[in-house]
Amino acid sequence: KYVDTDKDKVINTVEPLWTRKPADLKEEDYMNFYKALYPTYEDPLFYIHLNVDYPFHLTGILYFPKINDRMTVERNKIQLYCNQMFVTDHVDDIVPDFLTLLHGVIDSPDIPLNVSRSYLQSDSNVKKISGYITKKVADRLEDIFTNERKALEEKWDNLKLFIEYGMLSDEKFCERAMKFALLKNPDGKYFSFDEYRKAIETEQTDKDKKVVYLYATDTEAQYSFIEGARNKGYDVLLMDCELDSHYINLLERKFTDCRFCRVDSDAIDNLIPKEDRTKPELSETEKNDLSDLFKAVLPKDYDYYVTADNLGKTGEPILITQNEFMRRYREMSNMGGVMNFYGK
């Protein structure tokens, strides 16, 4: 049935909000636009409105979605437009890899279309656009850290995967993120890197002048170790993100005068030695005899070492630990590398 009418029929009901000036928009406008684009998703954490016309033309709105773990990650949710005409939702050759975790829209007539991947990656405008978007994301996060610290802390658990991945995969973003990335202890207290360093360096500096960052990955399983550290006056970080083994390695490279130790990787007096060890109480023969005694009753199908060592005056008589380096290396190997984390 055909009906004559002089009214236009609206086919696309989603208004291109990115073409409007940020000053003309309210929070509600941004949230409604997000719901129109992604009706089944939870509200985003933050958003960024992009608007630049020199040395390239770019408009857009990018949203930070909630990311709880790698199972909730979805790539390719950024829609690319050219003068409001949809082009693709695969922008991994246009924006840095970690930014493909964001949602939203970017619109630019300066991004070449129908060209090879290698040409796209070498195009000067694409490089400038990529760098600009990374800078705006870092600017937004730093602004929230400076002016809305409480809001950042409240949403940190949903942001940390994104920020850690960005720091691990993009050097420029990493340098910026060192100012606003947060550390968290089991009590739910948050610190910047500088704040935490100042809080622990007096008590947690070892005899070699290295600041020791103690951390736990499971507060229940490692409860007794956490309490043992606290009884010595030490603080413990909670690092339970799936990328944290890689992240810790990155931080140790950035802060060369520090080291990270999981709180259950040794006796607490050995994790932060304050003075040179005294001579062992047992002779080598006595230590070997004690080791053989334990090996005789331990399971045969596990790899382990039995050693007799000085666990300190207040240490437990027997301690089961996992070597920090070997455990961390195994965790990183099992993950298969940072770039494989999100299916690259």
Q: Model-found features: residue ranges?
A:
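Conserved GHKL (Bergerat-fold) ATPase module
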Residues: 1-344
